[in-house]
């Protein structure tokens, strides 16, 4: 299965899904440098807190390709940190990478950086998978009856916002994969229309869904036909 970010085999480079082209075009961008990684975060080619953190971790690994001294490492971390100052996962990932790399001699840092970035990515996948397992039980416990499970979601909290599986959408995928009859109401999420990314994801997975205007969400909830509402952009 495709992830949102992955290292290029046999090369010191990383491929990402260019999310600015979705849902109309599927494209992959190759990152060769820390500047490429910073631009990908800044331009929202990658988005979602978990994915931003993983991209930053790989950005530090890319930064050490030619020089792995302290100045290069710290300058790269500052560049990446400035791309999204409020992104918690970004700063967490950079701090973890620096904690792992700074005690090492420069000669050992490149391989260690790629290894740690891969570990952070794999940990995110596992965490999201477990969110799906746990969240599915909550969805089933709160369903209104034996009919179709009706879910409403806002913004995008699926695998495009992480490395795989997603956060709030992970239980939806877990339900569908378990053969549960499920339908998702996707709010468009103005002004950036992240709901279209959610709809694209769901279509790739085969999950039945309907995109609705943000203003229609309240009506659907008021009618009492929604089992659960997941995902938030602003609270």
PLM region descriptions:
Residues 1-35, 39:
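Positively charged, low-complexity intrinsically disordered leader regions
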Residues 21-22, 36, 158, 191, ...:
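Short, glycine-/Ser/Thr-/acidic-enriched flexible segments
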Residues 45-212:
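N-terminal active-site beta-alpha-beta segment that forms phosphate/nucleotide-binding
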Residues 149, 227-228:
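Conserved acidic residues
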Residues 219:
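Feature captures the catalytic cores and cofactor-binding loops of soluble hydro-lyases/lyases
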Residues 224:
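Active-site charged/polar residues at nucleotide-handling catalytic sites that mediate phosphoryl
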Residues 233-235:
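Conserved small/polar residues in nucleotide/adenosyl-binding loops
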């Amino acid at each position: 299965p495709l992830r949102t970010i992955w290292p290029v085999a046999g090369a010191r480079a990383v491929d990402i899904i260019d999310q600015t082209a979705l849902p109309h075009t599927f494209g992959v961008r190759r990152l060769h440098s820390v500047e490429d990684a910073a631009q990908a975060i800044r331009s929202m080619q990658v988005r979602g807190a978990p994915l931003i953190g993983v991209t930053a971790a790989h950005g530090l690994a890319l930064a050490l390709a030619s020089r792995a001294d302290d100045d290069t490492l710290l300058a790269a971390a500052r560049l990446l940190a400035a791309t999204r100052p409020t992104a918690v996962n970004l700063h967490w990932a950079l701090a973890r990478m620096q904690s792992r790399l700074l005690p090492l001699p420069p000669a050992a840092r490149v391989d260690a950086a790629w290894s740690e970035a891969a570990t952070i990515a794999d940990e995110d996948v596992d965490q999201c998978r477990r969110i799906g397992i746990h969240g599915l039980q909550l969805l089933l416990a709160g369903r209104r009856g034996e009919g179709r499970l009706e879910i409403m979601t806002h913004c995008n909290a699926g695998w495009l916002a992480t490395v795989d599986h997603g956060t709030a959408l992970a239980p939806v995928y877990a339900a569908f994969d378990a053969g549960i009859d499920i339908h998702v109401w996707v709010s468009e999420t103005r002004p950036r229309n992240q709901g279209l990314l959610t709809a694209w994801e769901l279509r790739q997975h085969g999950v039945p869904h309907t995109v609705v205007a943000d203003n229609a969400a309240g009506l659907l909830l008021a009618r009492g036909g929604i089992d659960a509402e997941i995902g938030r952009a602003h609270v």
